[in-house]
Amino acid sequence: MAKTLLFGEEARRSMQAGVDKLANTVKVTLGPKGRNVILDKKFGSPLITNDGVTIAREIELEDAYENMGAQLVKEVATKTNDVAGDGTTTATLLAQAIIREGLKNVTAGANPILIRNGIKTAVEKAVEEIQKISKPVNGKEDIARVAAISAADEKIGKLIADAMEKVGNEGVITVEESKSMGTELDVVEGMQFDRGYVSAYMVTDTEKMEAVLDNPLVLITDKKISNIQDLLPLLEQIVQAGKKLLIIADDIEGEAMTTLVVNKLRGTFTCVGVKAPGFGDRRKEMLQDIATLTGGVVISDEVGGDLKEATLDMLGEAESVKVTKESTTIVNGRGNSEEIKNRINQIKLQLEATTSEFDKEKLQERLAKLAGGVAVVKVGAATETELKESKLRIEDALAATKAAVEEGIVPGGGTAYVNVINEVAKLTSDIQDEQVGINIIVRSLEEPMRQIAHNAGLEGSVIIEKVKNSDAGVGFDALRGEYKDMIKAGIVDPTKVTRSALQNAASVASTFLTTEAAVADIPEKEMPQGAGMGMDGMY
């Protein structure tokens, strides 16, 4: 296919137009007085949201060069969402600011490679300073504050803090839609491990790409299943019992996989296969954990187990199982509670005896999976539109909370970025264009606070100057229009979110500046209807 080419300034300007279109759409949502964006959907009602990455994912521009710019910044939002789960709007805004400031200098003749070096140095310094002012999360109150700021709702903050308290920091928290009007918390015993389905054809919900099994039987084995004959006697019993099946095995392949998928597609019976979690000895222990939780038996060569001789009473049971591409959650395993308690105590004894940090971490994980359970936040609302919006906000708040527990918290409202400006500004370079890169970051660090003020209808520059001249940690509460100690006021951001947003924005933006040529497909001209095949005018 023929291509169209743009070079130098023209290429960068076209791409910058796309960056600005995406970033200007996203940044209106920043801060306590940020607005929402409404997204048209091909099916169902439009989606109203203030989640940066959700908005960015929907944006495709008609002009190929503008679209390239937009897609690059979309990557900033997506990467930040993957790493920290929140802060996507801030990341997009920072990327736009770095690109804008950088292009001014590149146009004036600065070397983009040297600018990139300066940006990298400044970002490393800024991250180091952000980590210095970070404070660990202490107790339920701090967790509630982080969640409340992320979701812009104190009730949600309290709900998530309750969930974290009930299942512990290692526990699993999921967000589901509720049939009632209110949002509530439900804690269910359960276990999650990071192995997904072996074939996408096994899903029961093609929109969410997940398989949900109600009251399934659970076959647990450390063998590889490739021959369907090994499973046939057991499958016949399961079909007669009218049950669904979850298979946890070393692997499922070949003829066995094909037969299971074909039967699922024909509707004969529903079966989902997942690979066993962990490796080596840890895999054996984790399979035993699952067996204890579900009341099943691990069918293993070590104890002379044979799949052909397996019976229904060797299978575990659970109230429900949810399998996604990456994880499996077993809820309310029907195992003997006494045996589960014994298993938990056994792991606790191992924890006390081990000296290896790695082993401790893995044992702690197993303990959480056996004892912690799964907390389910059920989101309710009057309409589907409101429900989707609330669900996205709660998911963001949950991610922010987990990030805060991992790396601590910093003053919110863009204050952390402004607080580190002085230290970053002290950096110097003998090479002029590297110094330009450092100065770009110094200016860009002001941008989140400026935008929060702008969204509250205020002049950002005045507020930034006042914060710069205040004590460290003092910022601007845009909701109440007051200057205060942000951490004491409960206006906090997770360190991980603040750090990731800056690192990802700088990574993509500095690479963007080094672009000297852009190549895109020439759009195909649409043929008028009825043309072609020499049939015009025929009736």
UniProtKB/Swiss-Prot annotation:
The protein's name: Chaperonin GroEL
The role this protein plays is:
Together with its co-chaperonin GroES, plays an essential role in assisting protein folding. The GroEL-GroES system forms a nano-cage that allows encapsulation of the non-native substrate proteins and provides a physical environment optimized to promote and accelerate protein folding.
Q: Where does ATP bind?
A: T29, L30, G31, P32, D86, G87, T88, T89, T90, G413, D477, A478, L479, D493
Q: Which CDD domains match?
A: GroEL
Provide the assembly information: Forms a cylinder of 14 subunits composed of two heptameric rings stacked back-to-back. Interacts with the co-chaperonin GroES.
Instruction: Could you list this entry's UniProt keywords, alphabetically sorted.
Output: ATP-binding, Chaperone, Cytoplasm, Isomerase, Nucleotide-binding
Among the entry's GO cellular component annotations, what is one? Answer: cytoplasm
What Gene3D superfamilies does this protein's entry cite?
Answer: GroEL, GroEL-like equatorial domain, TCP-1-like chaperonin intermediate domain
Kindly indicate whether the keyword Thylakoid belongs to this entry.
Answer: no
Give the catalytic activity: ATP + H2O + a folded polypeptide = ADP + phosphate + an unfolded polypeptide
Predominant cellular place of this UniProt entry's protein: cytoplasm
EC number, as in UniProt: 5.6.1.7
- A Pfam family in this protein? Cpn60_TCP1
Report the locations given in the UniProt record: Cytoplasm
Q: Would you identify the family this protein belongs to, as annotated?
A: Belongs to the chaperonin (HSP60) family.
- UniProt GO molecular function: ATP binding; ATP-dependent protein folding chaperone; isomerase activity; unfolded protein binding
Biological process, per Gene Ontology: protein refolding
